[in-house]
């Protein structure tokens, strides 16, 4: 039987001395009933299947495009069996959720405006090499399958990940290569043609961060990822994006279905827009000069109600069609957008009266909650973030079961966005995709400045509570987290601040004019063209996230926005520094963690049979002990003496000084035998007090049962009398101590007997 005809296209990306990476797209063999399906390969071992499906009928009463992106990680792709109880995949991993967001952001604005048929793109990870990322490949696969589906789609969209290793941007780097890199950037874009017929790559999405080892590499002389270097990275992505766009276009020419004429529901008719504009345009100009958010919203709601009533009256009078009522909200929003954007581009003034580069009033405060290990509040205008830091033993770090080679994470950042932060009601509970994404962005911004595990052996959980929201709570979370971590005593290598940039664009005199906005409001985010978040230290950028509603943004515009963001970040860092300029002393409620290194071959001895030895140390000292595979032992306790006592016992076992004949120890009787008593001198070091030596404690009298003289748990001062070839210790009592213990031992009332030979 003859199989299906397979169409393919590929792009070979040249990394110079780092070799080449081959991305291959295939169609026709898999998922043949989906409207569009593509198998995407990265070299030979990593394979994804992307399937794009579309519903047969438009969704009723939807005023948005119902697009769903799902990433299905299959454990078999990495040769694993899931670690869950049922041994099958369950809810998506955090990594899968983040990849969903990464794909959604450039794809969503590329579908035709007004589409209301449900579209679902499912990316299944079928195979992955142990050292590979699959996220950038997934962007290309999703775009390619959408290109083949027959849905009106302004692709292709290509995505690439680049790492700055030395002075070279390496495309599709491996996990192991990031150890040599100072910056890691993922860029999605498309090829556009201007009015003069010139082609360029327009940037649609950026996700970037300084790597975990960036600080040490920079100190060793590596390139510092400042704004200029980041701009170079955006330029470096363009040739690779062109190649991948060309490969997808080649596949589409071979295998794409004819474009289907799906019904499109435009948000409003021109007649509805004109009616709303005539009724509300002038007064909207006044409303959107009110600086206070609540006052502005109240005035806007009142105007919207009056305008809707006027439109309803016109409909009733037959001056407007019935559809004007259903189109009213979209038309009103569009008129509002015209008013706000026009004032920005024309006068350089924003709705709250600020200039384009002005920041709202800032406030920062630390140690705002009792008993927690670290806390802070950061406020920018009406955006208010509470940051709370919790420290614990490294054994509390997050264990990760995913396709990534990363299996644990000691720094965890969680972001919560309750409905009251915007003065509304809503669902509370498990985090949504947006909250997971915002938390991860703040985490990436801070990871490069965290102390190493060796310098600060703690698991760190950072929680950001959005108590008030009016623009960029994620960047507010970065600032609040910096304050809270310092308040908890975490020795950050440098403070980090973040700022959200916006963009407004329009055609003026035949040319597109752009205005970058610093510290955008929530309304400016909704009515603008871009959300560009930049976090960093005073010296370099640590994290970037870019989303746009446009088909793409020129890199020259992004370069200018980066420089504008640097000025704002510097100002915010000054405010943070005034609140706290160095790590505080650790809170008395925080655990004290100390470390000791032991030989790897001593790990088993320290643990003891079935954990007996280590559990005994923990029970006796009250400390928690965790042991790493490399022999690093971390000891934690709420008070210092407990930790030091545990360290002494660990050293006695794993780093002992060899006992010598003649040394005395205050030991504990741990076992009674017919021939004597075993006395514990140090953890893991026992010696035998022979029955002949026990007689000394009984005044030299014959001892039939050792239990008549000694009991388990009894303290006794002994001296080492002999160490045999196997290291076994023979003990004798020190009689001065024995005299003190006559009350508990069955000693005679007579004088001490002389020692027997």
From Swiss-Prot:
SMART domains, alphabetized: KH (SM00322), S1 (SM00316)
Domain S1 motif: 662-734
KH domain boundaries: 591-650
Catalytic activity annotation: RNA(n+1) + phosphate = RNA(n) + a ribonucleoside 5'-diphosphate
Region called Disordered, residue ranges: 736-757
Keywords: Cytoplasm, Magnesium, Metal-binding, Nucleotidyltransferase, RNA-binding, Transferase
Residues reported to bind Mg(2+): 525, 531
E.C. no: 2.7.7.8
Primary site of residence: cytoplasm
UniProt cross-references to Pfam families, sorted A to Z: KH_1 (PF00013), PNPase (PF03726), RNase_PH (PF01138), RNase_PH_C (PF03725), S1 (PF00575)
An individual GO BP term: RNA processing
Function per UniProt: Involved in mRNA degradation. Catalyzes the phosphorolysis of single-stranded polyribonucleotides processively in the 3'- to 5'-direction.
Family: Belongs to the polyribonucleotide nucleotidyltransferase family.
HAMAP family associated with the record: PNPase (MF_01595)
NCBIfam families documented for this protein: polynuc_phos, pppGpp_PNP, PRK11824.1
Protein name in the entry: Polyribonucleotide nucleotidyltransferase
Organism listed in the record: Clavibacter sepedonicus (Clavibacter michiganensis subsp. sepedonicus)
Phylogenetic lineage: Bacteria, Bacillati, Actinomycetota, Actinomycetes, Micrococcales
